[in-house]
Design a protein with these regions (language model features):
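Rhodanese-like catalytic fold shared by cysteine-dependent sulfurtransferases
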Residues: 1-16, 20-21, 28-61, 66-123
Length: 123
């Protein structure tokens, strides 16, 4: 199935659209510092666990760093089969966005993902 591709220019112009969900499919080490502004990190291997978090009628833009947007296209296929109607893939993925210096933000680190366990309940 062919999915719509969205250009970096089109995505930039829509970054503040509250109906738009931008999903970062890169691996943890790839997205450890920066991501596209407003993007949410989702694990491709756990797609069936997180797809219910998104309204099926909303617009979803996927991006990754795999050659030819391979990971984004694979997840777009899964979302489409699950009834999502408006799924796009960022043309050129993360590399195009980063090279162009478009709006990015620092990823909020999760202490548990780095093996740091907070001292809960200890003095």
């Amino acid at each position: 199935m062919a999915f719509r591709h969205i250009t970096k220019e089109d995505l930039t112009s829509r970054l503040e659209d509250p109906q738009l969900f931008i999903i970062d499919l890169r691996s943890n080490w790839e997205n450890s510092t920066l991501k596209i502004r407003r993007a949410r990190r989702e694990t491709p291997e756990d797609t069936n666990l997180w797809l219910a978090d998104y309204p099926k009628k909303s617009e979803i833009v996927l991006y990754c760093s795999s050659p030819g947007e391979k990971d984004s296209l694979r997840i777009a296929e899964i979302l489409s089969a699950a009834g999502f109607e408006n799924v796009s893939v960022l043309s050129g993925g993360w590399a195009v966005w980063e090279t162009a210096g478009l709006p990015m933000e620092k990823r909020i680190s999760d202490p548990l993902s780095k093996g740091v366990v907070p001292n809960v309940g200890k003095p």
